[in-house]
Every structure is written in C-alpha cells, then in structure tokens.
Amino acid sequence: MSDVFKKFLKLEAASGIILIMAAVLAMILANSGLASGYQAFLDTPVQVRIAALDINKPLLLWINDGFMAIFFLLVGLEVKREMLEGALSSRVQATFPAIAAVGGMLAPALIYTFFNYSDEAARAGWAIPAATDIAFALGVMALLGKRVPVSLKVFLLALAIMDDLGVIIIIALFYTQQLSLEALAVGILATLTLLWMNRRGEDRIGLYMLVGLVLWVAVLKSGVHATLAGVVVGFMIPLNGKRYASPLKHLEHALHPWSAYLILPLFAFANAGVSLDGIGLSSLLSPVPMGIMLGLFVGKPLGVFTISWLSVKLGIAQLPSGVNFKQIFAVSILCGIGFTMSMFIASLAFEHGGLDYGSYSRLGILVGSTLAAVVGYLALRMSLPNREADQSTEGL
C-alpha cells in the first residue's frame, strides 16, 4: 500500500473525531440558551462585491455553497486519481465497489420513497439516505487498528468514492434550480478553458484555481449547484506535470488538512444543530425522519451487501483478497453513516421546503448515522481476527 494512501486513511480517521465534536457542539448550542446566538451566527449576511458582481448570502449558504465546493474539488481529485492509477483503475478492481455502491444508493432511496410517496414536498428528500460520509466511516474502521485488512479499507474507500460520484450526478440532475442561460454560457466557456489548459499540458495550479473561481461564480448564478464547479476543476487538474511531479497529488495533499480539519467540521457545526424542543418519539416516527433513518440503517447494508453477494455468486465480480462476506456485511452497515453528505443533500432537498422537513431530516440523519456507526463497529469487530487483542495482552 502506498504512503499516500496510508496518510489519507489516518487523516480521514482523525477528521471523524473532529466531526463528532463539531456536531455535538452544534446540538448543545441549538438546545441551550445560546440557540438564538447560534442561529444569528449562521444567518450573518456576507456580501462580496467586485465591480458589477454582487454575491450576498447568509454565512450558512457560504459554507454550503462555497466551502463545500472546495470539498468537492478534493472529491474530484480523488476520483480522478483512483480512476487513473488507484482502486478504480482497472475493470476488475472497480466492478465490485461500483456494483456495491449502486445497490447502496438504490435501496435507501426506495425505502425513503416508500414512507414519503404520498407527500410531494417530502419526496424531494429521496436521495438523502443514499450518501455515505467517508470521514466517519473510515474513522470508525480506524478504531480497530491493524486488525482491519488493507483490502477491506480499499473496498470501503473505493465504494465511498463511487458513492460520491453518484451524489454528484444526483445533484446535477435532480437538485438544479431554474437555469440562467447567460451564467450557464459563462460556465461552459470556463469549463472549455480548463479543458484546453489540461490538453496543452498547463500545470500551474494557480491558473486552474483562477478559472475555477470564474466557473464557481457562473455556476452559482446559473441555478446549477455551485459545488459541481469544484468537481469539474478537480477533474481538469493534470495528474502529471513539469513544475510538480503530479499537480493533482500536490493539490490533493494541500487540500486534505483544510477539508478534514476545517471545511467538513464547519459544515457539520452549521448543519447539525437540531433543536429538540417539542420533538418526541412521534416526531422521530414521522415519515421523513423514519424514511431517512431506516434508509441509512437498513437500506444501506441491505443494498450494499445483497448486490455484492449476488455479483460474486453470479461471477460478475470477485471478493477482495483476504476479505470474507461477514466483513463485507459489517462494512455495508458502516456505509449507512450518511452524516455530512446526507445533511448536504437535505439542505438542497428542503432548501425552500415548508413545515419542519429540514429539522426532521437532520434528526433522521443523526439517529440513522449513529445506529450505523455503533452497530457497524460491533459487527466489524466480531468479524475480524483477534490477533491485535492477543498481542496487546502479552505484556500484561
């Protein structure tokens, strides 16, 4: 296993702890005497004006549309690297996690739709339980240390990357508002410029970021969700260059700490603050949180494991070396940790929704993700060899 991958796993595991702390802090603030201050902080207007350009949004939307675009830039870089030289670089390597990812998105979406089919406004949240939070999932897996086979970690990483691709496609197709053709034309021109730079071998990252900023503003104004600009820029950064051995890896390594220790925790802090005032068991059992909770905790493992098992039995794919189906099932439960990615989709699905869909969706995400994390950890622990525990008791 490469040093790059080892560093990535360690970083994502540490990020999971900070994410939990940020989410817990948000919950405490939202349910304390500081709740109004917490909400006022998120509603703080932030305006950027350059000549005729004027962007005026509350801080919450700057976090969701701006900072998360940087996170999706990192996702684009990771996906491209894995497709060119990593876990998705060959058909044999990519087939198993790709099939698992498809099953892991379909089953939760169907379960959610089953509970909310009669409510047109609530149906907009069908994709919420389809996402996986890679930082949390890898963080839980990291608690078991060296007992976890490397091939199992690679499977989870590859599956999560394929899952991210699916989320990107879902956002582009289903959560796009009314389009502005003028802004869209500027976005297309910026994309073509990035493609031209890539084709001619341009490896100055600063130039890509400059054109990428133009693309982000254009996409923001066009009605397409602005985070997609980050994905496009990520795909356009060249893997090999002259100034750097790999501009893509150089930028990826530079962005990882910012994403892991600032962007995702800040997003969690801004979106996880659910007020529990007036929320009881009946609230949790209402269609939106119930659909999300069961989609994550039941639908994810059902979809991932069932499709994985069938693909192996039918000879379409093969199990990673050193991995058994008990471990695949445990990982499939961990895939139900939707947290930040599910909350991101919820912020799009219910951006203009009425009632308490936003709060209810976050409640379902928190409960479903927590159940998936706890049960997934226990299932994985029981499925793994106990050699590390044996070694740790030798000196006692």
From Swiss-Prot:
Primary site of residence: membrane
InterPro entries given in the database record: Na/H_antiporter_dom_sf (IPR023171), NhaA (IPR004670)
GO BP, sorted A to Z: regulation of pH
Transmembrane spans: 14-34, 59-79, 95-115, 124-144, 154-174, 178-198, 205-225, 254-274, 278-298, 328-348, 363-383
Compartments reported by the entry: Cell inner membrane
Keywords on record: Antiport, Cell inner membrane, Cell membrane, Ion transport, Membrane, Sodium, Sodium transport, Transmembrane, Transmembrane helix, Transport
Catalytic activity: Na(+)(in) + 2 H(+)(out) = Na(+)(out) + 2 H(+)(in)
Membrane topology: Multi-pass membrane protein
GO cellular component, one term: plasma membrane
Gene Ontology MF: a single term: sodium:proton antiporter activity
Keyword Heme belongs to the record: no
Keyword hit for Cell membrane: yes
Gene3D superfamilies: Na+/H+ antiporter like domain
Protein family per UniProt: Belongs to the NhaA Na(+)/H(+) (TC 2.A.33) antiporter family.
Biological function: Na(+)/H(+) antiporter that extrudes sodium in exchange for external protons.
Protein's name according to its UniProt entry: Na(+)/H(+) antiporter NhaA
Origin species: Aeromonas salmonicida (strain A449)
Name of the encoding gene: nhaA
